[in-house]
Amino acid sequence: MKRKEFIKIIGLGGLAISVVPNGFSATLGTKTNEEICRSQWNTLCGNIGEVYKTDAFKYVHPKKGKPNVLIYGDSISILYTSEARAQLDDKATVFRLFKNGGSSQNFIPNMNTLQETMFQPNLKEGWDFKWDIIHFNVGLHDLKYLKGKNLNKEGKQVSSISEYKMNLQAICEYLKSNFPKAKLIFATTTPVPAHAKGRFEGDSVIYNKAALEVLEKYPDIKINDLYRFTKPHLETWAQEPGNVHYKELGFLAQGKEVAKIIETEL
């Protein structure tokens, strides 16, 4: 799969798009109180940093004159966030979603929660800035199969291909409608190894193909092909055989790659 850049043109027929209320848009020049924002952020995140044993969820405060970057994704992104943030430390302020982003159907509700919770006017003296770059991925939680709440290949798939494409198109429209000045970067879904629990090897290829079909309509959304970047190192980077997650060698390399791609848009 070759990394490409696509640029997107809005045009969605009858698809219903969730639009952030005007009240979510911060008024420029209003005071932001770091203590209030930090407290709100810590409440929003809860103990997720302890669960994942990472500082990816530590509070970061916007800095005057620095671009504001948001990383949205699942546990793969949770692991590489800290390295991406470190690589861009002198160039941008890198935020991430307050939780594991989950499947494509969770994207818009999660983004709305972030805006409603952390930004003015909903939070008095809260964040007061616009996103300059949003780097996002959905897919690994769409292609999985669940029986109840447990990963099980005999269970039901979270999102069919058609559902995934519909959700991703809605996501693109949502981002363009609510964050029109933000540069958007979509990261392809990383590989599913053989014998993965609740996931079938090769499904990432199928879902990435579907994603690229959607993104062809949005050529200004850049593609960060993390699948292609990761695939040659799957065996050496995997935490263990059959695990979709990566050990430090892998997620540090992914973090550097994500930072490199983001930097091209700064």
Predicted regions span which residues?
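C-terminal segment of N-terminal export signals and the immediately downstream linker at the start
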Residues: 1, 21-45, 49-50
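N-terminal export signals
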Residues: 5-26
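Conserved SGNH/GDSL esterase-like catalytic core that processes O-acyl groups on lipids
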Residues: 41-166
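Short acidic/His/Gly/Ser-rich catalytic and metal-binding motifs that mark active-site loops
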Residues: 142-148, 194-195, 231-236
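Generic structural signal for well-ordered alpha-helices
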Residues: 168-172, 208
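A short helix->loop->beta-strand "cap" motif at the edges of active sites that frequently abuts
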Residues: 179-183
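Substrate-gating cap/lid alpha-helix
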Residues: 189-226
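Histidine-centered active-site loop/cap adjacent to the catalytic His
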Residues: 239-266
